[in-house]
């Protein structure tokens, strides 16, 4: 019986050793699986956080773009209103007392640009003022001219139009940034 007992003890020891070894391997497998799961979880969390941050950046960028678009629209609207006010003023400037001086300068500049001028065309409402300002050149009515003159040469084939509204049109693009800046202040 002692041999049986000895064999049984030895078998029991071997079983315990195998069980312990299996438990150790199982614990290692579980630990490795937990580590891989944690690594995967951390990786997914980083990915989600990066996606969240990217979404926030996109949302901020979209909001900034929308804000800038609104500012630009407001600025353009303000510039348009300023130009409309100036055009309204220029439309009424012909009735101002100082308009004779303005028309005189417009005529002089036109004559300098076209030295061989045959005629000066002005709006019919400005004929009397223009006749007093011009000598040596025919003064004609031209209803399409408003707030200025058209100096004509070579039978009307060449000439220059010098009006206040024309001058405004020429400087609009250059003045828009300055007007926008002033409106923003």
From Swiss-Prot:
GO terms for molecular function: ATP binding; proton-transporting ATP synthase activity, rotational mechanism; proton-transporting ATPase activity, rotational mechanism. Keywords: ATP synthesis, Hydrogen ion transport, Ion transport, Transport. One of its GO terms (cellular component) is proton-transporting two-sector ATPase complex, catalytic domain. GO terms for biological process: proton motive force-driven plasma membrane ATP synthesis. It holds the Pfam family vATP-synt_E. Gene3D superfamilies: ATP synthase, E subunit, C-terminal, F1F0 ATP synthase subunit B, membrane domain. Transmembrane segments: none annotated. Belongs to the V-ATPase E subunit family. Produces ATP from ADP in the presence of a proton gradient across the membrane. This is V-type ATP synthase subunit E. The gene is atpE.
